Structures are given as C-alpha cells and as structure tokens.
Amino acid sequence: MTDFSDDLAALDAQALRRRRRVVESPCAPELVVDGRPMLAFCSNDYLGLANDPALIAAAQEGAKRYGVGSGASPLVCGHMAPHAALERRLAEFTGFERALLFSTGYLANLGTVPALAGRGDAIFSDRLNHASLIDAARLSRAELNVYPHCDLSALAAALAASKAKRKLVISDAVFSMDGDLAPLPELLALAERHNAWLLVDDAHGFGLLGPQGRGSAAHFRLASPRLLLMGTLGKAAGGAGAFVAGAENAVEWILQKARTYIFSTAEPAPIAHALLTAIDLIEQGDARRANLAARIAQLRATLKPQRWQLLPSETAIQPLVIGGNAETMDVAARLFERGLWVPGIRPPTVPAGSARLRITLSAAHTEAQVARLVGALKELE
C-alpha cells in the first residue's frame, strides 16, 4: 500500500501541486493573507457583496430568528421559511416558473444532470465545461458526447445522429477559465429542434449579465420549457449555495430524483435569509455592474502583453495565458512578493501548454488597484 510520497513528488516535479493560503480578513480586494496585506485579483465576489454591511446584518438577523444550522435534509425538516422565500424570489427574479436550492453549485450540477438523464439517454457537453458538469455527466451513466468548444455544427451533427430516448445539452454560460460566453440562443434552438433539454450553468453570469443582473437567459431573452438554469449564490450574490430554475414539472422531478438534494443537509437558514437581501442588491446594482465593466475595459486597454496572451474575454474573468506550468507559477509567486494575489491555473484545470493567470475583477476594485496590477505584469513579462 502506497503512502502517496512518489505521487506527490511527481506533482512537485511538474509544478502541479496545489497549496492553500490562509485568509485572515473578510472577502474584499484588500486582504490579510498568511499575515501579509495583499491586493487580490482571485475572488469570484464580482459585485463586492460578500462583505456588504447589509448582507452581514441580514445574516445576523437570520441567525437570531432561525439559529445557525438547518439540521436536516430539505425533505425531512431542513426546509425553513428563508429557503422557501428565497426559492420564490429566485424564480421570480430569473423569470422561471420554479427554483430549487442546493448547498453548492457543484452539488446542484451533480444532482440535476443524473436526474434528467441516465442509461439509454444521451448527454452533449461542451469540451470546456466546468468539472461539476463533466463529473455529473459521467455519474449519470448516459451516453456522453463531448463536442469541441462552442462548435455548433458538431453539436448539431451529434444531436441528429443520436437515437437516445432523452437528450440533454449541458453548457457553461460564461466559461470559468476562458471567460467567453456560450452561444446560448443557438444552443437552445438546437435543443428544441432535436427534442432535447438544455441545462445552462450560469455560475459566472448570474448577478452580472442581463437586465438587473438576472442572468444569461435574461441576457439573451431566452424562454423555453426545455431550458434549465443553474446559478450559484457564492459568487456575484456574495453568499453560498446554488439553485436550479426551470419549468414547474422539471424542477419537481429534480426535487424527487436529485440525490445531492435528497441526501444533503439544507444550507444554513441565516445564509438563505441574507441572500434575500443580496438579490435586492443585485437587482438595484447597475452602478456596481457599471464599475465592474469600467475595470474590465481599463485592464484590457492598458495591459498589452507582448509574449503572453490575454484571451478575448469581456467578462470579469480575464485569463492571461503564459504557457508553461513552472513559468506561470513563478510569475504568480513574484506577483505575490509584490503584494498582488493572482492565481496560477495549470492542467488538468486547463489544457496542457495553456497554464495561465486567472485574473478576476470585482466592482469593488478601484482604478488605482487595477493600474497597480497592470504595472506589475508589465515589469514581469
């Protein structure tokens, strides 16, 4: 029986070993990390809500009214008043008939996909989908068809050739490592043409895209009984958890069949209570989204890499591809020495040879903070 020493050494040799740092302050651009002040460009707190005083006050109020833990699965006694209210609010906000809460986005996908497709069915997945969608598709035991990134012709051909009794197309809305946006109108049109369902992972679009931040479906004005939207509540919403929204019967089926919903303790009621306030702030958050857009435009206008490649993203995710694992991690370490925290992303998260710095911007970042990052990157290239 191995003690994994050789395996860990192999990770070290390839510059693939992951390490954690300890954050000693609330989520914000300016952090205390391992005892050091740090300017962070690595959080998914896109609207700066995670440390918002209104959310903190709402969480405190929720804890006083409902306690800390929910105590059970939602199907036992864990479904509390804030959960029910939040599901109604999310359905209304995103424009779907019904919404269902999950404890995390990973669990939402891992439960929803196998509930919708199984043996005898077929799943069609974009090659660059998030790990949770990939794992969910494998877990489902459905026939898995992986199509090249955003290749509509390949997807159309695969759908046309499939004889499966039920077909499910799954795709990120905003791809988490490249920052680009999926062609959702075309994906939905293909799904409807071939009698398939479309599940969209809107983890990085909810709160940011569409009128009042209502998400990717609203951004493209999509509506269909065959469309399901998964959104996370720990990114732009500043809290924790996730939801799946869709037609009444589809969501009811997921409630009945999603094992990660049935066998997981419900998220803490104080968080659900705070998220009701978060949805209000998202709805009223045009100024926050405008500031985020300004910071994105600033970065792209001023960071003009010569040797590295800034991928063509217009979202808060701005990937700077360096290439090699060792060089990428060296640049990340040198930025950290300068008080700038930008994570290096390596295989298997991204394809070999495309290791990168994953720069994420927030509405809470200032013009001066982005300028500081750009200056440091220019010095290091």
Residue map of PLM features:
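PLP-dependent aminotransferase class I/II
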Residues: A236-L303, W308-L311
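Active-site PLP attachment segment
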Residues: Q212, A218-W253
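Active-site phosphate-binding strand-loop segment of PLP-dependent enzymes
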Residues: D45, N145-V200, S362
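Conserved PLP-binding catalytic core of the aspartate aminotransferase-like
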Residues: A290-A297, K304-R338, S354, L361-A363
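Conserved PLP-anchoring active-site segment centered on the Schiff-base-forming lysine
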Residues: T112-A131
